[in-house]
Swiss-Prot record:
UniProt-recorded Gene Ontology molecular function terms: DNA binding; DNA-directed RNA polymerase activity
Example of a GO biological process term: DNA-templated transcription
Pfam annotation, one family: RNA_pol_Rpb6
Name of the protein in its database record: DNA-directed RNA polymerase subunit omega
Gene name of this polypeptide: rpoZ
Reactions performed catalytically: RNA(n) + a ribonucleoside 5'-triphosphate = RNA(n+1) + diphosphate
Keyword Transcription annotated: yes
Annotated GO CC locations: DNA-directed RNA polymerase complex
Alphabetical list of SMART domains matching this protein: RNA_pol_Rpb6
Gene3D superfamilies: 3.90.940.10
UniProt entry tagged with the keyword Transmembrane helix: no
NCBIfam families noted in UniProt: rpoZ (TIGR00690)
Amino acid sequence: MARITVEDCLLQIPNRFQLVLAATYRARMLSQGHAPKIESKNKPAVTALREIAEGKIGLEMLKKVPG
């Protein structure tokens, strides 16, 4: 299992506060049943960080706040 680090994610979203918000929103979406954009058997939070690190998810998550 490859480990995900904050440094990998910061290359995609340089502001760590925005990174946390984007990962939180995406993890919430995943836990509500949205399909992941990558192949993953991890928990929603880890999957969200992996999606960010791979560039599949970015700051657009801050404009799509789940309701």
